[in-house]
A protein has these predicted regions:
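C-terminal and inter-domain tail/linker signature
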Residues: 2-151
């Protein structure tokens, strides 16, 4: 049974803010991200053993990601989006090329392979007013590793 539900104005507004944030990431516009991301945000990211606490720590993490994948790009409009209240989920693809060193937590460095990736990417977010306060970002890490020539 297929059901449809009208997008609420709150959900539509949050999807617009999320798009603005992903567009800012794509343009490497940290000032806009700082407006959208709450100072006390928490990020749960695939592959990280611990959550990332705070806007500044999240920005540092994203800068490390971009140093590995300088052309990383979150595609909009989203393939799927839905939400309720202060929560939304968006699903899209993220693409990029592994051209920068990958620094592992144990200090090892993985040299770039020059290989491209294209993986489905989901983000579930909670908003406090017009600021993102919590995010869980998901992708298939095994598929990403295979595409990068690491598995």
């Amino acid at each position: 049974m297929i059901t449809t539900e009208k997008t609420t104005s709150r959900t539509a507004h949050l999807v617009e803010l999320m798009t603005k944030g992903d567009d800012a990431f794509n343009n490497r516009n940290q000032a806009t991200l700082d407006v959208i991301h709450h100072p006390d945000m928490i990020a749960y990211v695939t592959g990280n053993a611990q959550p990332i606490y705070g806007r500044d720590a999240h920005a540092k993490f994203m800068n490390q990601f971009v140093s590995m994948f300088p052309d990383a790009f979150v595609h909009t409009p989203y393939l799927i989006h839905f939400g309720t209240g202060d929560w939304i989920t968006v699903i899209t693809n993220v693409t990029g090329t592994f051209t920068g060193e990958m620094k592992l937590p144990d200090g090892k460095v993985v040299p770039p392979t020059g290989k491209k990736f294209d993986v489905e990417f989901a983000q579930t977010t909670k908003w406090k007013g017009d600021q993102l306060i919590e995010i869980a970002a998901f992708w298939d890490a095994a598929m990403l590793a295979r595409q990068l020539g690491l598995a």
